[in-house]
Amino acid sequence: MAEITEVRIYKSKGNGSVKAYASVSFDNEFVVKGLKVVEGEKGLWVSMPSRRMKDGSFQDVFHPVSREARDKIVDAVLKAYQEQE
């Protein structure tokens, strides 16, 4: 997997379940924007960038294929978020 070289956190304003947005840079060559840090019933989790389809459903714009890659991204985003608390 590409190395995560930077994570930027943008705190959300308001009291909704979305606590922050994040962008993740890989290998200092490309960036994925629009990840969300969401507070749910079981704690914080990270939502991958998605868009709403005409039928109202959501489709991921970016998502890791392997569990290992997903865990690496989620861990990096949550760590960066918690460091800003």
Curated annotation (Swiss-Prot):
InterPro entries: SpoVG, SpoVG_sf. Keywords: Cell cycle, Cell division, Septation. SUPFAM superfamilies: SpoVG-like (SSF160537). GO terms for biological process: cell division; sporulation resulting in formation of a cellular spore. Pfam families: SpoVG. Belongs to the SpoVG family. Could be involved in septation. This is Putative septation protein SpoVG. It comes from Archaeoglobus fulgidus (strain ATCC 49558 / DSM 4304 / JCM 9628 / NBRC 100126 / VC-16). The gene is spoVG.
